[in-house]
């Protein structure tokens, strides 16, 4: 487990339905974060990336995309040219589990909708939520709740949203800075929890799966 670098990821969307869209996709490693923003064709205020980086200690590389297909195309290029070339594992919190999850099913639907190939095939995947449900005695099950109980306030204080539903409202209003900050808080909380779990749990406690399609 630990010989594979953790790449945490999380997405933001306009909702949960089949025709809802991606607004943000973020990845985080120990070195930096990589964030893709769908602007829906709008023009963000000047200096957005600089303001985001002024708020956050570890660098964030931000790219802007006018549409969801453009975001997905650039995302696929990043995954295949960068992530799959590393000894890395993809990690999410409730991204995809045996009984559900959100991020990966949503991504599959959007790639399929636009007729794009699935880019994550060679990356192993771990859902860290499973470990904390089974191997830690916590009273919370949300990402922020488990992080707060086991690690402390830290990145929870960074998150500008009290409810993830705010991510939809601010995107529609073109208020991208808090949306990006929320996503970065999520991916960094996810990576922090994965590192915590690796310090206290055995390899057999983690369920690692392949994301490679059959065909």
Predicted feature locations:
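Terminal disorder- and signal-encoded targeting elements
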Residues: 1-5, 208-215
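Conserved non-catalytic scaffold segment of RNase H-like nuclease domains
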Residues: 2-108
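Metal-dependent phosphoesterase core characteristic of DEDDh/y 3'-5' exonuclease domains
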Residues: 30, 87-207, 211
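Short alpha-helical "patches" and their helix-cap loops
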Residues: 38-43, 206-213
């Amino acid at each position: 487990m630990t010989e594979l670098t953790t790449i945490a990821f999380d997405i933001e969307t306009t909702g949960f339905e089949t025709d809802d869209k991606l607004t943000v996709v973020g990845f985080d490693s120990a070195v930096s974060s990589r964030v893709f923003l769908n602007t829906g064709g709008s023009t963000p205020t000047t200096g957005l990336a600089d303001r985001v980086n002024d708020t956050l200690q570890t660098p964030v590389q931000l790219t802007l995309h006018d549409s969801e297909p453009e975001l997905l195309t650039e995302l696929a290029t990043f995954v295949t040219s960068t992530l799959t070339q590393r000894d890395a594992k993809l990690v999410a919190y409730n991204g995809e589990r045996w009984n559900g999850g959100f991020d990966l099913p949503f991504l599959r639907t959007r790639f399929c909708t636009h007729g794009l190939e699935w880019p994550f095939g060679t990356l192993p995947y771990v859902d860290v939520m499973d470990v904390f449900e089974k191997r830690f005695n916590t009273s919370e099950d949300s990402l922020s709740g488990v992080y707060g109980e086991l690690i402390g306030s830290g990145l929870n204080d960074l998150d500008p949203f009290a409810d993830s539903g705010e991510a939809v409202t601010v995107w529609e209003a073109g208020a991208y800075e808090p949306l990006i900050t929320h996503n970065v808080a999520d991916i960094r909380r996810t990576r922090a929890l994965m590192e915590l779990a690796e310090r206290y749990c055995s390899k057999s406690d983690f369920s690692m799966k392949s994301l490679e399609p059959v065909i």
